[in-house]
Amino acid sequence: MNERVNIEPTTLTQRHPELGTGPVPTDMYWQPEWYERELKAIFRRAWMCVGRVEQLPKPGAFFQKELPTFGFNVLVTRARDKKIRAFHNVCTHRGNHIELRKEGHCAGFTCPFHGWSYGLDGKLTAVPDSEGFFGIDKGKLGLHEIALDVWEGFIFINLEKEPAQTLKEFLGQQGADLVGYPFDRGVATFEYEGVINCNWKCMVDSFCETYHVPILHRHSVKDTLAGPDNPYGRLIDCRLKGPHRTQSVWGNAAYRPNPVQGLAFANAPGPSITSGAVEEGVKLPKGLNETRAPHWSIDVTVFFPNWIIVMGTGRSEEHTSELQSRFGI
């Protein structure tokens, strides 16, 4: 059973006085120069989530992941040795895409331009009319591999040739505190995407506060995350863990959805306020509802720089804020 922990309310600025209490600078949200610095200093160095191991159930499986941030896509494969690898989806001959399908199963890849073939391990296996080339060395012409590692079934890549940190080091306490959550028992129920005309940090920031809930979500989740005891939906807890952060969201225990609302919320991250999970003693990872508050609903965990998991007791959902540069008046 989860042990109740009674702690005095502590604000984020009390824990981290270095954050200050003044207005937030705005240059980082609109200056093209700042954005270019972010690409080099952050996104080319950070570990980024590209998928789940369940997308590669057996050898021969593959999927593509678009990286609009950099204008290319990544090919993620499971080879005969069962190892998961990632490659630039680019033929080493003339730079053509070698695979056009978003996902599938195959024995290898053949470039549709000149027929160069590669194994699922990225090795160059065949070159038509290889005698017509001078000094061709297949061992040096395989697909360009990208650093890859797995955390709790999530596949991460790093675009640095030699990443400065391992994935475990990069995730740090945030990753350690969430080990054991039953991600592998989940079933993907839906996926959606949208284009939002804003800086990528605006999207991430919106998940890090619940101040907007009573207004923006007044026709949907307002009554689940705000109520007479907490009319503005203030957070229970907020913590910084290295570059990552997590927020515990309050839940209205008095809320009872009508049948239509219950159906709409059926595939949302399961809040304890409707399942009674905290009362029933569902075992949670250390980092989920860290204060063990009985009126807890969900945690919003933000993995730097742009990956978010909304986690309840029974379901979770992931959000990624992708980047596409468009600057203008």
What is each of the regions a protein language model found here?
Residues 6-26, 184:
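Short, contiguous pre-domain boundary segments
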